Each structure stands twice: as C-alpha cells, then as structure tokens.
C-alpha cells in the first residue's frame, strides 16, 4: 500500500521536493527499522522461548501470546530487507517475490497484532466481569480455535497486499514499497483501505474500549483486597494495549486515510507534499514498532513471569546435576483458568 508516501510527481517541476524527502526517508526508515528489528527479534524471541519451555503451564493467555510472538518474529525477519532498501537509497535488490512478501508480512503482523490483542482483551473482560461464564468460555481449546480463525482471516484478507510488486523508475532503478502509480490503482487502494480501516481498526478499537470500560467498572466495584494479582494483570493489559493502539495503530490509520485522499488531489503544493511524505515515514515506523509493544504485554500483564523463569532455571539445574529420583515439582494445572 502507501509505504513511502511519495506521490507521483512530474520530474521537471517537483524534483526538488522528491529529493529532499528521499534523504529524510532513507535515514529515518533505515535507522528505525534496524532498531525495531533488533528489539523485536530479541524481545519476542525471549518471550517465545519462555512460553515454549514452560508449555506444561498451559493457559488461554499463553496461547494468544505464542501466536502474537510468532507473528512479530515473522515480520521482524523481513525488516532487514527494508533496511537494505533504504540504505541503498531506494533501490531494491532482492527480486519481485521478496518485495511482495515484505509488504505482505508487515500488514499481516499489523492486523494479527490488532486482532490478537482484541481477543485477549475480550476474554480477559469475560474472566473478570462474568466469572461464571469464564469457566466454559476462556479455555485453551477455544483460544486455539480463535487464533486459527484470526490467522486464516488475516492471511486471506491481506492477500491484496501481495499485488505490491516492483517496478522500474525513470532511472531504471528497481523500486519497492511505493504508492500506486495510476488513478485506477489509487481507487482500488482507497477501497481496500476503508475495508481494512473499519474491520481491522475501528471495530477492534471500539471492542477494547467497551471491554476495558466494563473491566474498570467491575474492578472499582469489587473489594481492593480480592484478586490482587488478577487486578494487576488487567491493569497491565489495559495500559499496554491502549498504548499500542494510541502510539502504533491509530496514528498510522488516521494518516493513511488523509494520505490516500491527498494522492487524489490534482494540485499539490510542494510544502504540503513534504509534510505529507514525512508524516507517512513517521506513522509507518510507529506502526511497525508494534512488534516492540507485544513483549511488554506479556511482561506486564501475563502474570507469573518470574515463576516461569524459575521453572526454566530448575529444569536447567536438574539436567546439569543428574541427581536420580529427584523431580522438579511442576505447578498444578487448572486452578485458575485465566491465571495468565
């Protein structure tokens, strides 16, 4: 879709504007994508390692976090390709397939993150507001089914992004991540944008607002001394998910709406073009940074993180000492279906 925010500009009249944003774009994207790649890879890799090593402590929350970490890792593995593209000043070196895959991976991760966070918020709301129904609704099996449905839905509905192929510019350089070049493609992208805006952002955002409002009212009415750990996990989830929506998802979707309509304007003043292009660079980088928010969701709202690390250390020590007939005691299952 609108990756770099460079509208089609006549080479003779507006070349100065195009060149100035190229320098800004290449520096910002290459720097921020590099940082997001490193932080996202190690953060999500560590979360996935802890969750897999302690998989015997199954919970619905763990199922969602595993899927969220996998989606993030798949995305950050393609970010180095973007870094190389902008380091080489907007010249694509990796063929048409990887160009399509890189664009596709970013949007699959973006909307998988939104839907996984929404599902986690909904089931945490059910666990707190409707504790009786929680027993039958918030289960590992249902969490797995929800995750499968989310993956299938996002993979299929994001398939139009696979159409974002490479092309040659007037200097015969191979380009990738560029906006549509003709009006027919722009109209198609605008329709695709509004579908993804309502289904992939507005509806999930309204859902989490309703869920968090119900959670807050329930916590305020209940005794402060009861379920202190559950209260902390709920507050942690509210803070992290709300921050992800406000910092990563909302600015990007608002700016993308404005930008796509801007591309349809016949007259574009130079200063407006520069401001629009720079805003695309900032908001798209913020959207990609959701890979760094997701590990925080586990650290601050997953609960029992230290206990899981302690379990891993016990397994490591027991495997090194070779003491027979001494087994590491495992946490009991099923005491709290929404303990994570």
Curated annotation (Swiss-Prot):
Transmembrane regions: 32-52, 61-81, 110-130, 145-165, 197-217, 234-254, 280-300
GO biological process: calcium ion transport; cell surface receptor signaling pathway; chemotaxis; establishment of localization in cell; inflammatory response to antigenic stimulus
Main location: membrane
Intracellular or extracellular location(s): Cell membrane
Residues modified by glycosylation: 14, 172, 265
Signal peptide residue numbers: none
A UniProt-annotated Pfam family: 7tm_1
InterPro entries per the UniProt record, alphabetical: CLT1_recept, Cyst_leuk_rcpt, GPCR_Rhodpsn, GPCR_Rhodpsn_7TM
Membrane topology, from the record: Multi-pass membrane protein
Disulfide bond sites: 99-176
Keyword Cytoplasm: no
GO cellular component term, pick one: plasma membrane
Protein family: Belongs to the G-protein coupled receptor 1 family.
Protein name: Cysteinyl leukotriene receptor 1
Organism: Cavia porcellus (Guinea pig)
């Amino acid at each position: 879709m609108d990756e770099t925010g460079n509208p089609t500009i006549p080479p003779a009249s507006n070349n100065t504007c195009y060149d100035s944003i190229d320098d800004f774009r290449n520096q910002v994207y290459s720097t921020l994508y590099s940082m997001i790649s490193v932080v996202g890879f190690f953060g999500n890799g560590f979360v996935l390692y802890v969750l897999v090593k302690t998989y015997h402590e199954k919970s619905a929350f763990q199922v969602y976090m595993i899927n969220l970490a996998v989606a993030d890792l798949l995305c950050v593995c393609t970010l180095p390709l973007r870094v190389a593209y902008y380091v080489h000043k907007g010249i694509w070196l990796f063929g048409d397939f990887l160009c399509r895959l890189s664009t596709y991976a970013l949007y699959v991760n973006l909307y998988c993150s939104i839907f996984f966070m929404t599902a986690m918020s909904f089931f945490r709301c059910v666990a707190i507001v409707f504790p009786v129904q929680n027993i039958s609704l918030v289960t590992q099996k249902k969490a797995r089914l929800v995750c499968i449905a989310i993956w299938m839905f996002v993979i299929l509905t994001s398939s139009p992004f696979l159409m974002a192929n490479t092309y040659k510019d007037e200097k015969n350089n191979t380009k990738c991540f560029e906006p549509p070049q003709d009006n027919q493609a722009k109209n198609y992208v605008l329709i695709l944008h509004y579908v993804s805006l309502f289904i992939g952002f507005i509806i999930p955002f309204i859902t989490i607002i309703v869920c968090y409002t119900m959670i807050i009212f329930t916590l305020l009415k209940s005794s402060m001394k009861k379920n202190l750990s559950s209260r902390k996990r709920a507050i942690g989830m509210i803070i992290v998910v709300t921050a992800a929506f406000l910092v990563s998802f909302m600015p990007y979707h608002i700016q993308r709406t404005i930008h796509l309509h801007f591309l349809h304007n016949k007259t574009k003043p130079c200063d407006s073009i520069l401001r629009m292009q720079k805003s695309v660079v900032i908001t798209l980088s913020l959207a990609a940074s959701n890979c760094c928010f997701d590990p925080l969701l586990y650290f601050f709202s997953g609960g029992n993180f230290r206990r899981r690390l302690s379990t891993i250390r016990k397994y490591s020590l027991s495997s090194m000492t070779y003491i027979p007939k001494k087994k590491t005691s495992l946490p009991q299952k099923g005491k709290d279906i929404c303990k994570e």
